[in-house]
Amino acid sequence: MMAVRPMCQTTTPMAALPFRLIAVSGSSMLPTFAGGDWLLFRTLHLRDASHLQPLLGKVVVIERESYPGVHFIKRLKRIDDGRAWVEGDNVDVSTDSRQWGALQPTEIVGQVLLRYRRGRASE
């Protein structure tokens, strides 16, 4: 399972910020992302599946309704009946829709835009 931690504490509600920076922990997205990588993501406020289509194949940030405050990094693989099917790139160790089932669109809270890895920026 790949979870992330916020870079810093803030008094501004995180949902109000258009971009966030988080640190990666875990190995479920190897080789794309590794523990210690920093990710910049654009926050999303999806209310229904109509906005999922442009995210297909992209890496998204998930906040499960059953795990509030915990974020997961996964790739949006497909849309099933208006729900998001996500998987980690390292399928042998990833906990994802294969265990959770498809997610509500509201559980997709961001799209990863940029990675900072060990001293260099990359996409």
Task: Go through the PLM ranges and name each one.
Residues M1-E123:
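Extended hydrophobic leader/signal-anchor segments used for secretion and membrane insertion
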